[in-house]
Amino acid sequence: MVVTILNQLLLGHFDRRRFISNLLYIVPFSYLVQFIGYFWDWLQIPALSLLPRLILNVLGLLGVAAAVSIYQRCNLIQHPNDDLSYILRFRFLHGSAIIAQWTSYLQPLTIIVVSFFATGHLRAIGFGTVFALIAQGAIMGWSDHHVFPNLKHHVD
């Protein structure tokens, strides 16, 4: 909800369609993520050795970055965090997918750092998190030009 409000502030005006679509995305997405977790457990992915899990992790992250590139270009309905990177990219960062993605990660990174200093522990920070933080923007930018290249961004 906080990111949805931040998106509206960055737009400089209230965009009802965008606000509602951000909220509508969250609920089914949460259930999908939970279902995928159960599905991976059913396939016994967590029981695999490190190398196959790393390969699956990287392939999954490549797929997610390409998918975000596609649906950002469609710009129909977006997860609030993806919409944030989209707004930052085209309103403030001259179209740079890399810088926009890094900038959109400042909020969760701040929460991670504050939590670490408060507890002395890092939780749920693994290879996939670090890989996404470093490379997702670059993969999205590459996907913009190589995955359905005729699909263009509709900046509003």
Stretch-by-stretch model annotation:
Residues 1-156:
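Extended, low-hydrophobicity, polar/charged segments
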